[in-house]
Amino acid sequence: MTTLFLLIALFITTILNPTSGESVGVCYGMMGNNLPSQSDTIALFRQNNIRRVRLYDPNQAALNALRNTGIEVIIGVPNTDLRSLTNPSSARSWLQNNVLNYYPAVSFKYIAVGNEVSPSNGGDVVLPAMRNVYDALRGANLQDRIKVSTAIDMTLIGNSFPPSSGEFRGDVRWYIDPVIGFLTSTNSALLANIYPYFSYVDNPRDISLSYALFTSPSVVVWDGSRGYQNLFDALLDVVYSAVERSGGGSLPVVVSESGWPSNGGNAASFDNARAFYTNLASRVRENRGTPKRPGRGVETYLFAMFDENQKSPEIEKNFGLFFPNKQPKFPITFSAARDGTAVE
């Protein structure tokens, strides 16, 4: 009887105070001339219980603001720095200046060595740079605490339908297969930027808006026994399948960017952006996984914190969750924990 009461109490506690589920991360870009300071921005992260951030470069002011906050960090190596990191000494210096000087006060989780590098334009330096950064981490005995990866985009995918047939393009396998092998051998994860928005606007005839916005009332695509009610799950399973075909087995995939613009292009509206971000955040917090990998949490980073008026083309300026005056565009709950707060 005592055991029964304990189980009931645990159940009630779980319902009233949900503590499981992935926290939703946010990408923090700084390409705007009207944005809040880095310290004000990190304070905004904390006010809204945003527990994960992706930085695209080792901005010193942002890193200082992140000290002792407990916010997990993906720190990026800019593409322009990759070639220099093929020199082991330069990689050690980069790690010392941009990671070790802040650790452990800053909670680094991943080092993203490059973002959406084209295999034909710099692809040859990505893996050597990754290896050197990893070796530098190993020299500091941090290789098990901070993982090395790189962020890819969906242009590397060749076959994408059905999701179980996902495969990388034949002409990029020389690049991506060794990267996946490295990630597998170091127990890391692949970072993937996944945008249902661009898939939809590129093919609105075959992809419905409701499928892209998580608002379809029923399954839209069947892949054998797997039913897909939203495009995000389908695209992520395409990446999982492609990774498997490149020898990665069950290598985790982190969705390092996903977003929907509120202005500036086809289907770019406030209402569509609100639907996409709120529905994606809810799905991430629920830890439901995908049809291919059900029940596995999907670490996901929403793109982006602010509208950035110095980006181009026009569509790229309007992915912000917040206006530059720090006011939210729409309510989003970033964490499922009991102290989680919704942006009102």
UniProtKB/Swiss-Prot annotation:
PROSITE patterns per UniProt: GLYCOSYL_HYDROL_F17
Leader peptide range in chain numbering: 1-21
InterPro entries associated with the record: Glyco_hydro_17, Glyco_hydro_17_plant, Glycoside_hydrolase_SF
A GO MF term: glucan endo-1,3-beta-D-glucosidase activity
GO terms for biological process, alphabetical: carbohydrate metabolic process; defense response to fungus; defense response to nematode
Primary location group: secreted
Compartment(s) where it occurs, according to its Swiss-Prot or TrEMBL record: Secreted
Protein name: Probable glucan endo-1,3-beta-glucosidase At4g16260
